[in-house]
């Protein structure tokens, strides 16, 4: 598994589908790309899809997504 991938991966529970759905928002052509019965399974499947999409970018099969960088905000204890 490539730990250097810089894409976002969203995992949500779906009552309708009774499973976790995985989305890759940096790839707008992909909505919900895979799923899993457990959070861990959904994450594993999501990473597999992400690696395949990354290879497609490297090979020039699909355009490179615009990477959105999020800077964490400092939160002070009150």
Question: Which residue ranges define each predicted feature?
Answer:
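Short, charged, surface-exposed hinge/linker loops at domain edges
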Residues: 1-8, 30, 44-78
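DNA-contacting interfaces and partner/effector-binding or oligomerization modules
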Residues: 2-5, 9-12, 23, 36
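Short secondary-structure boundary micro-motifs
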Residues: 7, 18-20, 40
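Short aromatic-glycine-(Arg/Gly/Cys) micro-motifs in beta-strand/loop hairpins
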Residues: 12-30
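A short, exposed loop/beta-hairpin motif centered on an aromatic-Gly-Thr core
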Residues: 26-41
């Amino acid at each position: 598994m490539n730990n250097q991938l810089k894409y976002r991966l969203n995992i949500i529970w779906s009552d309708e589908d009774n499973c976790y759905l995985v989305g890759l928002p940096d790839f707008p052509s992909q909505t919900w790309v895979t799923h899993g019965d457990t959070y861990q399974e959904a994450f594993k499947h999501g990473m597999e899809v992400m690696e395949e999409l990354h290879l497609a970018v490297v090979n020039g099969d699909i355009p490179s997504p615009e990477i959105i960088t999020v800077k964490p905000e400092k939160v002070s204890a009150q």
